[in-house]
Amino acid sequence: MERYGSITTPVSVPRLIVGAMLAAGVAVLILAFTQYGLLAGLAVSVIPAALCILWVTLRNPAISMLGLFVVNYFIMALTRYAHDLPFGMILDALIFYNFLIITLQALIRPIEWKRASSGLTVVAAIWMAYCILEIVNPESVSVAGWFSSVRSIAFYFFFIVVLTQLTMTEYKYLKYMLAVWSVLTLIAVGKACMQKFFGFNAAENYWLFVLGGRSTHIIHSGVRYFSFFSDAANFGGSMGLSMVVFSISALYYRNSWMKLYLLLVAAAACYGMLISGTRSALAV
């Protein structure tokens, strides 16, 4: 009988190096927990995950863009539960990280920069320039207020347009994005259904009855549900866009099961749009 291994087989040098690195990592982790406390131990334990993320995103920057897409989807929910965290800075850091990944990739292999020279990029650049010029508007209240507004409606728009064209370079990435988007849509609708059938949680009640959200979301015609979005208008607009995108996407899929899935997601998004009670979603 042929044997596939033996305990007497010499261990290769790379395996010895990996084993030594793992042993050293465990030792450092134990030292951090025992000598410097829980926070230090958690910080050290995150380093391997961060290195893995760096390696994966360097190999495929599209994954980093999908991660940015997911974080951007949920970050509005986090603002309701933790008011003091700088969530805008988190998005800034993630966008900078994506540009850094693209720059590092350019050192290894050529990047098709011309992909970013599209009509959409020109439109985004014109819009950003217009918003920048608004700083000299005499009606502007403050530079800080101007920057806070322009950062989200102009800078993010331009940077995301450029990054998407540089990273999503293959058709398969569009499928990946639709798959991620569909899951996020179902989660958003599920959260709205929880609000409708089980009620609001403590943070949502605080926003409604203390911060004044009640005046626009609990009205004479009923309750406008907002899921984990900032308000019902954003939730309804997002669900309206999801309904349109997934309805159209279902027409182009040949796989019957995928076609059915996308139609169900579109139907769920339509339901979410309806219970949001926002009229602006109809414009989508």
Language-model features, listed with the residues they occupy:
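Hydrophobic core segments of transmembrane alpha-helices in multi-pass, intramembrane catalytic enzymes
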Residues: 43-50, 72, 90-99, 148-161, ...
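Transmembrane signal-anchor hairpin modules in multi-pass inner-membrane enzymes, especially those
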Residues: 1-133, 172-175, 179, 252-258
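Alpha-helical transmembrane segments of multi-pass inner-membrane proteins
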Residues: 2-6, 14-15, 23-25, 49-52, ...
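Membrane-helix interfacial "entry" motifs
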Residues: 11, 111, 115, 140-149, ...
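Hydrophobic alpha-helical membrane segments of integral membrane proteins
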Residues: 64-68, 144-147, 175, 279-284
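Membrane-interface helix caps and helix-loop-helix hairpins in membrane proteins
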Residues: 35-36, 81-85, 139-147, 274-275
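Transmembrane alpha-helical segments of multipass membrane enzymes and assembly factors
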Residues: 56, 60, 163-169, 192, ...
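Aromatic-anchored transmembrane helix interface
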Residues: 90-95, 119-129, 143-166, 179-180, ...
